[in-house]
């Protein structure tokens, strides 16, 4: 996929990701040669209109999901439409049935490389003429990107509803009119290579890539999705053009449209824009290579870097549409991982101290795939012990059936997760993409029903059939200086029994039907309100806890009950003033450890009961620590809201902190810090903030080795004291948004939180005194940190800025920053990637906008040989930006862009709930959500240039560089004056 930042990161899938179905539920350009470089179809200068008889033909409908299928008879383009009118946004998603399985040696990675090239222009939409896809979409706001996987490629736009026709035009145009210029390929090659290098520096990605390459010797799944380096570097433009002309046709594609649109008008637009595109003139090249049965265990070891060791075990499985997928997905759920404290792998690997994280995944692919179990080994532990433990758990699955309770929980979890994943239009689009890739959208739609028919006996039979030693592949990732530690091994605890001890009904309440609107009145004032100020009800409990409620559901405005299975969900978001701001010097990890321990058991629910109930509801509920706040967010089926709130209340109010749990979390934290110490991005950032802030400032972070030392001083009393002091109703804001009956939810909240007591924390105030005085320092101050065996270098350039969300000039500064470097495309910094190919990703941003003096930074990653050149280009661009300022055209474009992005950011009830808690904690009114677009449009050019000139200069910025560098003039971890 293309690099992304900001909102795009919230849902973009990793390049090589293949979602398991049970988890669904994130060089100079030469114009002179462009005509000759174009494919024959690119000669067209405008899209052909449809002819009579090109009307889309209805094919089928899934009434439960609200999806309708159509087909264009002229070219067999498949069309899936799903109307969602709860929020005014639309997702347009084009899925091509081509992935890395369609490649061979010599042109591996072509699918992904071509995905990048699909943004490089047509005669109509050409970035060189400032009419490219990113240029025109920026004017309407929203998000666009693409992802590539083994079996498919998809291109998507998420935009305000009025931009739907533009998105359809863009997808129709690039389907057959791509220019594919040689100059574009040359520039983009180094971008793709940098993406590849970033993956090489990630031990988990590297291990997975080698696992597939070892398990598959003949089938194209052997090749990494991104391709082999020499193919990426050497593939000629003509080979990419051949690939494009082989697969990019309407009869190899499915167009998915989801959101707030008019069906009849949209179908007409699709007909007009796509019906004139011809279908493929020849059959699509088949994939006829099959993987023969494996005849013996295969092993490999990757030795590099200094990250924690990893173990991966993989077994061959049938194609995704095989009946065995359902029991295998049940087994995946039963094995679980580090995020589920009641699962078998958690008990066997995490609780015993063998591993710091782990997971099981059934890779559901078009052709036979893999079932993978992976674990990150705790420092000092022999990976062979982890492998042996994994093998023991696999053997248990083949020896006796899973329990009836495990089967029930797995079925419930898979069904609920599937349902909840569809509440976000982008989540639905991506889920459909995976289903189309594996089999068909109908197979995907029937999946949650069919998986309910899987039995414990089928799970046992599948384990016996597929989890065989002779079809196993085992991979180790070992750091170059790997050693085992007898003391660490001696601390391993015996595993606990896997029987479930939870009481699935213990959190249920009698108010379930009352709290969900499908059983209550549809006449609330909020149902017919149009503004968020009118729709959101804000009130305080007598103890000072602030609550925000809003009914947001399909059919709410019309007074119709929400009976659709993909609706009827509720988002809950909480924000507590209890972040790093309230930590003590020498105890910086206490806020983070406290947040982590909240899910380890309460006075009412054991750790396993909490995990079991989360699994039953198909949700996660984790508390995270931030600079100023602790927060959590979750989304449940409406009928599960009382159960979720009961758990939230118990975890926030009555956590049962125990020494054994603290010991485990401290050990996991040590492993996490050790990983950070080998991450170029983490190390570069840590060096940067230590050069900008004094100890005691909230934005300062101790050196990573110091953070490791601090963990040993944290006691149970530190955790208890911190929780008692900062977890109180007066510090807490809770938002409940979705398919609710507000009056019933009020009663529920009063019952769960009404008798909660506690003191309100001191107000947050960040002073300039926490900054290191850099006046008079050289403008090119640079920190360099050497890390061995790194293919990629991370660069962070930053400085503190006296700016926050409540600043009068915040919006002006926000616009100025967006002009400079909102993302890697269509901004001032874009040439660093798009023209020069120096980086996969570059952007500028304010790190923590809640309060002033957080870092404003420019972040990028580059090949080690491109560090100096990249820094020179960035400095030149910023200097020009400072000298000439923002133009009136850039202002107008960014005003429209940011207004659209903001609207798209409120596309789901989960994002709405989070935005409400953010604003409430900063004492900003709900009306800010209604007036954002207007306020952005009211910002003047003078305002923007004044703010940009004040905040976004590099004169006093510090540059931090980390990677495998050859630095002769500067000592390691030094600052050059």
Give the ranges of each region predicted by the language model.
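N-terminal secretory signal peptides that target proteins for export/translocation
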Residues: 1-8
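Bacterial N-terminal signal peptides
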Residues: 12-30
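Proteostasis/folding factors centered on peptidyl-prolyl cis-trans isomerases
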Residues: 67-71, 237, 375, 456, ...
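M16 family metallopeptidases and their MPP-like homologs
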Residues: 82, 86-113, 129-174, 206-230, ...
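Short, conserved secondary-structure transition motifs
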Residues: 193-199, 289-302, 410-421, 636-637, ...
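Alpha-helical scaffold elements lining the catalytic groove of polysaccharide deacetylases
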Residues: 231-240, 710-714, 719
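Bilobed periplasmic-binding protein-like "clamshell/Venus-flytrap" ligand-binding domains
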Residues: 458-478, 730, 945-963
């Amino acid at each position: 996929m293309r690099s992304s930042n900001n909102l795009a990161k919230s849902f973009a899938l990793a390049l090589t990701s293949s979602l398991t179905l049970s988890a669904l539920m994130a060089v100079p350009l030469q114009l002179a040669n462009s005509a000759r470089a174009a494919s024959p179809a690119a000669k067209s200068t405008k899209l052909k209109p449809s002819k009579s008889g090109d009307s889309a033909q209805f094919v089928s409908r899934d009434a439960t999901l609200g999806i309708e299928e159509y087909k264009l008879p002229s070219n067999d383009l498949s069309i899936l439409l799903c109307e969602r009118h709860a929020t005014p946004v639309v997702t347009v998603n084009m899925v091509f049935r081509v992935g890395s399985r369609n490649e061979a040696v010599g042109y591996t990675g072509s699918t992904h490389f071509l995905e990048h090239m699909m943004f490089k222009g047509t005669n109509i939409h050409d970035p060189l003429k400032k009419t490219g896809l990113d240029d025109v979409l920026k004017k309407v706001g929203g998000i666009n990107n693409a992802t590539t996987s083994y079996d498919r490629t998809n291109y998507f736009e998420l935009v305000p509803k009025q931009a739907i026709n533009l998105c359809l035009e863009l997808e129709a145009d690039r389907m057959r009119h791509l220019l594919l210029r040689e100059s574009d390929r040359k520039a983009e090659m180094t971008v793709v290579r940098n993406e590849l290098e970033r993956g090489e520096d990630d031990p988990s990605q590297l291990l997975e890539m080698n696992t597939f390459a070892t398990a598959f010797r003949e089938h194209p799944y052997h090749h990494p999705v991104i391709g082999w380096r020499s193919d990426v570097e050497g593939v000629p433009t003509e080979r990419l053009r051949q690939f494009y002309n082989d697969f990019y046709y309407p009869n190899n594609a499915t167009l998915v449209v989801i959101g707030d649109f008019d069906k009849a008008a949209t179908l007409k637009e699709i007909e007009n824009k796509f019906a004139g595109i011809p279908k493929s003139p020849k059959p699509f090249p088949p994939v006829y290579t099959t993987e023969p049965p494996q005849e013996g265990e295969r092993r490999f070891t990757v030795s590099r870097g200094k990250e924690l060791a990893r173990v991966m075990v993989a077994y061959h499985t049938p194609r995704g549409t095989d009946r065995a997928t359902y029991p295998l997905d049940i087994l995946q759920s039963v094995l679980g991982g580090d995020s589920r404290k009641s699962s078998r792998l958690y008990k066997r690997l995490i609780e015993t101290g063998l591993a710091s994280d782990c997971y099981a995944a059934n890779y559901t692919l078009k052709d036979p795939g893999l079932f993978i179990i992976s674990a990150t080994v705790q420092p000092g532990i022999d990976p062979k012990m982890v492998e042996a433990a994994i093998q023991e758990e696999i053997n248990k699955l083949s020896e006796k059936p899973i329990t009836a309770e495990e089967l029930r929980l797995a079925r419930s979890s898979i069904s609920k997760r599937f349902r909840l994943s569809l509440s976000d239009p982008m989540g639905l689009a991506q889920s459909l993409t995976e289903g189309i890739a594996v089999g068909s959208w109908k197979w995907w739609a029937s999946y949650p029903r069919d998986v309910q028919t899987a039995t414990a006996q089928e799970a046992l039979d599948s384990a016996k059939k597929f989890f065989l030693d002779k079809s196993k592949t085992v991979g180790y990732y070992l750091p170059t200086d790997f050693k085992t530690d007898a003391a660490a091994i001696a601390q391993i605890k015996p595993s606990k029994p896997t029987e479930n001890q939870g009481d699935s009904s213990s959190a249920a309440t009698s108010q379930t039907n009352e709290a969900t609107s499908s059983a209550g009145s549809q006449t609330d004032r909020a149902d017919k309100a149009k503004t968020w100020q009118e729709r959101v009800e804000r009130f305080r409990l007598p103890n000072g806890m602030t609550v925000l409620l809003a009914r947001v559901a399909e059919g709410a405005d019309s007074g119709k009950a929400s009976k659709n299975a993909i609706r009827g969900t509720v988002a809950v978001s909480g924000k507590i003033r209890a972040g790093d701001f309230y930590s003590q010097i020498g105890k910086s990890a206490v806020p983070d450890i406290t947040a982590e321990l909240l899910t380890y058991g309460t006075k009412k629910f054991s750790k396993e009961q909490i995990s079991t109930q989360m699994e039953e509801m198909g949700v996660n509920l984790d508390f995270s620590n931030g600079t100023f706040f602790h927060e959590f967010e979750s989304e449940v089926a409406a009928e599960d809201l009382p159960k979720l709130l009961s758990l939230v209340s118990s975890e926030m109010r009555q956590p049962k902190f125990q020494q054994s749990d603290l010991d485990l979390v401290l050990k996991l934290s040590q492993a996490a810090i050790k990983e950070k110490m080998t991450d170029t991005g983490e190390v570069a950032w840590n060096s940067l903030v230590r050069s900008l802030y004094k100890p005691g400032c909230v934005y300062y972070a101790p050196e990573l080795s110091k953070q490791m030392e601090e963990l040993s001083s944290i006691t149970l009393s530190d955790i208890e004291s911190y929780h008692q002091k900062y977890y109180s109703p007066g510090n807490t804001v809770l938002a409940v948004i979705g398919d609710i009956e507000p009056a019933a939810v009020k009663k529920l909240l009063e019952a769960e939180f009404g008798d909660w007591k506690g003191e309100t924390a001191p107000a947050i105030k960040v002073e300039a005194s926490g900054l290191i005085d850099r006046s008079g320092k050289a403008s090119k101050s640079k920190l360099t940190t050497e890390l061995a065996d790194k293919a990629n270098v991370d660069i962070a350039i930053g400085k503190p800025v006296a700016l926050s969300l409540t600043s009068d000039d915040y919006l002006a500064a926000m616009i100025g920053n967006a002009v400079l470097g909102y993302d890697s495309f269509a901004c001032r910094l874009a040439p660093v990637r798009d023209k020069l190919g120096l980086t996969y990703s570059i952007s500028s941003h304010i790190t923590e906008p809640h309060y002033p003096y957080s870092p404003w930074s420019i972040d990028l990653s580059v090949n080690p040989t491109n560090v100096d050149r990249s820094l020179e280009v960035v400095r030149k661009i910023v200097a020009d930006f400072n000298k000439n300022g923002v133009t009136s055209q850039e202002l107008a474009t960014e005003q429209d862009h940011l207004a659209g992005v903001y609207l798209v950011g409120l596309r789901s009830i989960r994002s709405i709930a989070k935005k409400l808690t953010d604003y409430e904690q900063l004492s900003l009114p709900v009306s800010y959500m209604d007036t954002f677009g207007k306020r952005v449009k009211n910002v003047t050019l003078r305002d923007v240039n004044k703010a940009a000139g004040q905040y976004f200069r590099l004169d006093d910025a510090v540059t931090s560089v980390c990677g495998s560098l050859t630095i002769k003039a500067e000592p390691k971890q030094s600052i050059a004056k």
